[in-house]
Amino acid sequence: MNIFADFDARIKKTLQDIDLKPKDGGELDLSRIGVEPPRDASHGDIATNAAMVLSKAVGQNPRELAARIAEALKADEDVESVDVAGPGFINLRLKASYWQRELLVMLNEGTDFGRSRLGAGKKVNVEYVSANPTGPMHVGHCRGAVVGDVLANLLKFAGYDVVKEYYINDAGAQIDVLARSVMLRYREALGESIGEIPAGLYPGDYLVRVGQELAGEFGTKLLEMPEAEALAIVKDRTIDAMMAMIRADLDALNVHHDVFYSERKLHVDHARAIRNAINDLTLKGHVYKGKLPPPKGQLPGDWEDCEQTLFRSTEVGDDIDRPLMKSDGSFTYFAGDVAYFKDKYDRGFNEMIYVLGADHGGYVKRLEAVARAVSDGKAKLTVLLCQLVKLFRNGEPARMSKRAGEFITLRDVVDEVGRDPVRFMMLYRKNDAPLDFDFAKVTEQSKDNPVFYVQYASARCHSVFRQAADQLGLVDLDRVAMGSHFEKLTDESEIALVRKLAEYPRLIESAAIHQEPHRLAFYLYDLASSFHSQWNRGTENPDLRFIKVNDPDLSLARLGLVQVVSDVLTSGLTIIGADAPTEMR
């Protein structure tokens, strides 16, 4: 249960009970009331701004109104004390019995604790990675892959119906270049000396194997075909090979998509999907024939000094109108974006999330304009931009072997440090902030390595369970037994740990609403820190040890607390796509 939602309802009920009315009549607007943890934990457990946001409407001084509300809240049987602070904040401190009762709820819910129905009935498409199928994934793709995957997992946990999607850019000019590059490797595999790879083609050694496979399958037959026919075959085989490589790279990172959508699908049957999308926009009055003035700076590839078919995107929030069809009748890449969004909308998605690299910042307004025009404002589109990742080794820029050409691959990074450190650390900054990834730091066993610190907390929880088996003979811990004596958890440090656990449902919902999966990584680190601190207190003070052989009921209660910590760590790490280890290896 979200305790902050619980007390939001209680506070609003209290406002009704004291018959609070606006001075001008009508109903009070309670939508701006906030209920959250105080910024300073010493001030209490729950804080609300109710008096400050309502004072003007009711015509009363904020502190006086706060005192009136506070007095009424003291009647709540779960409230220990109520204080008014600053200009009119109301801080509530809750009784230990409340936290003991909430801990039992958490224990009974297990790893489902924190699961929400926030997104019930909402269908969301999260598109991420969508790397061009021209080679292995490089480290620049890594952050977007993790952010998109974890965001999708988070939204699912918050009750949304989520589809993870990868858009295969397999219809552009770069694919023609790729096919010609592989054709060269095919000739090489047949024994021809090809010399230096010509400028403009892909030089990567990863294409050698594709050429060899073509030579094994076709022999010299491709050389005997008309070039266009041979290149079409090479293109299909190469896209399949590149996507197999990309899927393997993603699998190594524990990233899995539900849908792989081919751009070529938009171009079948004389690009019927694109034509239909443009026709729909035309019927809505969003398309016209015109000539765009030359933009400042470097000219984009779709600008022409002649009449084109244009999208009236400035009427729906964009900076400039966008070309859909060139003067020669060919479609722009942007026209495909329109058709692809329409395809998503026609599949019933209420919301589309695009996770893109920071170099795609110029796409944001045009995509938002497409969403407004295609859906008549009914669908929500969000673009998350991921800033660059800089690689370091002991504080110095990383120097790594580049086995795939001119870049460090995603697989290089995962193979060296492991999947879990990569996933966790890619979340340890907000996606729109640059991120430094230090190979030494993410493998050291210290508090300064967040993923180690969190996973070590999980392992420590299980070590407590093993101690219970050794010292108390409790091999199979029973949740009913563990939850039957929570009234014995009275130490302030234990209650503080319960408070931290109780924040989890609110954290899940806020991270989902704001689409900020990094919040989960931060929370797990804080929870791990709280648990490690409690462990250390037991080391310093025998009375606070989790296992008290001479007090089995207290031991069971503390084991229940440890079980909930383990459940929340497991839940959060699962959403992140990392393991919750039972022991460190």
Curated annotation (Swiss-Prot):
GO terms for biological process: arginyl-tRNA aminoacylation. It catalyses: tRNA(Arg) + L-arginine + ATP = L-arginyl-tRNA(Arg) + AMP + diphosphate. Disulfide bonds: none annotated. One of its GO terms (molecular function) is arginine-tRNA ligase activity. One of its GO terms (cellular component) is cytoplasm. It is an enzyme of class 6 (ligase). NCBIfam families: argS. Monomer. This is Arginine--tRNA ligase. It comes from Brucella ovis (strain ATCC 25840 / 63/290 / NCTC 10512). The gene is argS.
